[in-house]
C-alpha cells in the first residue's frame, strides 16, 4: 500500500461510473479497469508528464526504427491535470508490492492479450483491499515510471479537482509539452505538419 497525495496528476483515460463495466476481452479494455460494478468508475492517471505520455500517447503503438511519432497518436487527445482533494491509499502492484501479493511481474507488465487476466487480478486486489482507491503499477512503456488507476468506490467517494486541460496537438502549449517529452524522455519525434 502507498499514499497518493493531492498534487497534479495527468489523466490519460477514463470510463464514467454511469456506464456498465466493459466485458472481458473488449478491444478497448485497459490493463486494470475493474470488472466489478461495486468499485465504481475509474480513471487512469500518471503523476508525471512522461507517465501521461507513455500511457496516453504511446500505449499500444508500434514505434518505427526511425523513432517517428505519427499524427493519429496525437489528435483527439487532451492533457488534463487534476488534483486529489485529499490523500488516498492505493495498492502497489509492482516491485516489493507485487511480491507481497504473490504476483508475477510478467503478468502485470504483459501486453494487451493479457488484459483480461490483469483486469480480473486487479479487481480481486481492490475488492480485498477496502481502503484502496486504486492501484499504482509499473508503466509498460518506461521501466522507471509508474502510473495509477484510481477508482471512485462509494462512501466516501474519491474527489478530484480539475486544474488544467489542453489539447495536445492543436494547442501550442499542449503540443510543446508533449513533443518535448517525446523527444527528451523517449527519443521520439514528430516530423509532420503542425497546425497554426
Describe the role of every protein-language-model region.
Residues 1-27, 62-196:
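Active-site and NAD+-binding cores of ADP-ribose-processing enzymes
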Residues 32-64:
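Extended catalytic/binding region for NAD+/ADP-ribose chemistry, centered on the ART fold
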Amino acid at each position: 500500500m502507498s499514499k497518493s497525495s493531492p498534487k497534479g496528476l495527468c489523466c490519460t483515460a477514463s470510463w464514467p461510473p454511469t456506464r456498465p463495466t466493459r466485458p472481458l476481452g473488449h478491444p478497448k479494455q485497459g490493463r486494470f479497469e475493474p470488472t466489478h460494478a461495486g468499485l465504481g468508475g475509474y480513471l487512469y492517471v500518471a503523476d508525471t508528464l512522461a507517465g501521461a505520455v507513455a500511457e496516453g500517447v504511446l500505449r499500444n503503438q508500434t514505434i518505427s526504427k526511425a523513432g517517428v511519432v505519427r499524427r493519429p497518436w496525437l489528435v483527439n487527445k487532451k492533457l488534463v491535470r487534476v488534483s486529489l482533494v485529499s490523500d488516498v491509499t492505493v495498492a502497489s502492484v509492482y516491485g516489493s508490492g507485487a511480491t507481497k501479493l504473490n504476483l508475477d511481474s510478467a503478468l502485470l507488465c504483459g501486453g494487451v492479450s493479457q488484459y483480461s487476466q490483469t483486469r480480473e487480478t486487479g479487481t480481486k486486489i481492490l475488492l480485498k483491499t477496502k481502503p484502496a482507491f486504486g492501484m499504482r503499477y509499473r508503466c509498460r512503456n518506461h521501466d522507471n515510471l509508474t502510473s495509477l488507476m484510481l477508482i471512485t468506490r462509494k462512501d466516501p467517494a474519491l474527489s478530484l479537482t480539475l486544474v488544467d486541460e489542453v489539447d495536445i496537438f492543436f494547442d501550442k502549449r499542449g503540443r510543446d509539452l508533449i513533443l518535448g517529452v517525446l523527444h527528451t524522455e523517449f527519443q521520439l519525434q514528430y516530423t509532420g505538419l503542425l497546425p497554426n
